[in-house]
Amino acid sequence: DKIVAMTRYSATDLLTNLAVRKGKPKYQVFRVQINDVMVRLRMLQNHEIDAYWLAEPQAAKALQADNNVIFSSADAGVHLGVVAVMDKVRRQTEEAAFAEAYDKAVDQINKKGVKYYADLIKKYMKVDDATVRALPDIKYTKIGPPRRSDLLMAHNFLTSGK
């Protein structure tokens, strides 16, 4: 039996489905809900669970410790990032200002690279210089509507009962 750390009813739950379908393991795969990525990384370092979904820079930190990638969300062909505003009253001016600021940040990060922001990454993500140097060249996308194929995949996942 294998145990995967992920978050239920989320992108990592959907991606776990894709990975299990692709890998066709002999034994049952159990999903445990570990929402905090920092906790997942510590569990990986302590060999507590078989597989984990990690975002950057935690994924870079895990790879530095000779762990293996068995499935990458980048290879799944699905784009699940979203900015959601959940207010009872739409605040279009504030939403537009947020989108403009977000898109400016994306332009700056894509222009300068994530490693340019090493001090911020180290401060808020609690990683060292070696981890920052190991980060891949990540390119971010601006705010835009979701792709129809991604909406359909998410809808099918949520309504299928897995």
Where are these regions (language model features)?
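Residues at alpha-helix termini
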Residues: 23, 65, 125, 161-162
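Pocket-lining segment of extracytoplasmic ligand-binding domains
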Residues: 28-121
